């Protein structure tokens, strides 16, 4: 069965045609927006998509290490290590990264939303944000199962520490909040410290 996410990206992405002195050039819409320093996380967080986002972040830093990057997130979450590769790159590069939730930012999506530049983490009014502890499954010998259980516990502790860093909440508050699926409105996410503000309308550009 065809992956619906792959089908969307390969078949339904619109093309943008631009005129220049050299003639016409066609871009897919995401490549065109990348020129404006806009990156998207759409769908599950997984290795291939995470590698593309990391590459885009590094490319934009190489182009201009001081200019802001806008990171739009609409994701149900996914693989923790894939999400952490994006998170670490966001913290590593010199560019400030503005995050904006459109639709949903759940699980690793919410962590990446919170990881944006302080004061520049946003959500649209009807966005939904969800936080929870990591989950996983493993089959094998009893000793190996225990090893994987310890690894999940270590990841849980590390993720809690990251949420503490970016929300300003104490560890126990984060631990309790992430014990079960915890769904939030944009207002609740702002109160919790995952975002800084809710955007209802794009601000008018400053007068020249």
From Swiss-Prot:
GO terms for molecular function: ATP-dependent peptidase activity; ATPase binding; serine-type endopeptidase activity. One of its GO terms (biological process) is protein quality control for misfolded or incompletely synthesized proteins. Its main location: cytoplasm. Signal peptide: none annotated. Its EC number is 3.4.21.92. It is found in: Cytoplasm. CDD domains: S14_ClpP_2. The active site is at residues 107, 132. It catalyses: Hydrolysis of proteins to small peptides in the presence of ATP and magnesium. alpha-casein is the usual test substrate. In the absence of ATP, only oligopeptides shorter than five residues are hydrolyzed (such as succinyl-Leu-Tyr-|-NHMec, and Leu-Tyr-Leu-|-Tyr-Trp, in which cleavage of the -Tyr-|-Leu- and -Tyr-|-Trp bonds also occurs). HAMAP family: ClpP. Belongs to the peptidase S14 family. This is ATP-dependent Clp protease proteolytic subunit. It comes from Methylorubrum populi (strain ATCC BAA-705 / NCIMB 13946 / BJ001).
């Amino acid at each position: 069965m065809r992956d619906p996410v792959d089908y969307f990206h390969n078949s339904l992405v619109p093309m943008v045609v631009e005129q220049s002195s050299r003639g016409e050039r066609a871009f897919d819409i995401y490549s065109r927006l990348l020129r404006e320093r806009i990156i998207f996380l759409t769908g599950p967080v997984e290795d291939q998509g995470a590698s593309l986002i990391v590459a885009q972040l590094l490319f934009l830093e190489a182009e201009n290490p001081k200019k802001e990057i806008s990171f739009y997130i609409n994701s149900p979450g996914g693989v923790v290590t894939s999400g952490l590769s994006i998170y670490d790159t966001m913290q590593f590069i010199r560019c400030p990264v503005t995050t904006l939730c459109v639709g949903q930012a759940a699980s690793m999506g919410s962590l990446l939303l919170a990881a944006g530049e302080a004061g520049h983490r946003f959500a649209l009014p009807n966005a939904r944000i969800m936080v929870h502890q990591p989950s996983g499954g493993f089959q094998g010998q009893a000793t190996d199962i225990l090893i994987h259980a310890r690894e999940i516990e270590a990841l849980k502790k590390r993720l809690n520490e990251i949420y503490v860093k970016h929300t300003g909440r104490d560890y126990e508050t984060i631990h309790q909040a992430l014990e079960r699926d915890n769904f939030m409105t944009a207002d609740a996410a702002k109160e919790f410290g995952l975002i800084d503000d809710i955007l209802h309308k794009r601000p008018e550009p400053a007068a020249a």
